[in-house]
Amino acid sequence: MVTGLEMEDSMGIIREAYGVTKNEDRVTKYTMTNQNGMRVSIIDFGAVITNIWMPDKYGVLEDIALGFGSIEGYEVNKPAFGAIVGRVANRISNASFTLNGKTYQLEQNDETNCLHGGTKRFEKRMYKAECSMEEGA
């Protein structure tokens, strides 16, 4: 955990290398800073929020996000700390559901249940990020 960072007055987006996956995908970290000095870092592997720095009443930033310090931690550990969840969130009992009279059978990856969309979950995918500094973006 990073602690004791001084607030910056500048807003913007910083892009930097974060690591390489075991599939040899280059992972990029994007750190966004707002006008209040709050910072959020997101990587393009799993769209994971790796850091959230919030200023305290003295203006000192503290990282309040729970996560891992490297790409390897996000690849091999089961908790999806800060990652996008999908195709569904939580468990689907008996890995099946009925919608409009049709029953859909899903992959069982949590005993007899389907957890967070199966083994090809969104948290283990690479995403393509685009930076934008448009107002309200």
Residues of each region from the PLM?
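Surface-exposed acidic/polar loop and edge beta-strand patches at domain peripheries
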Residues: 2-137
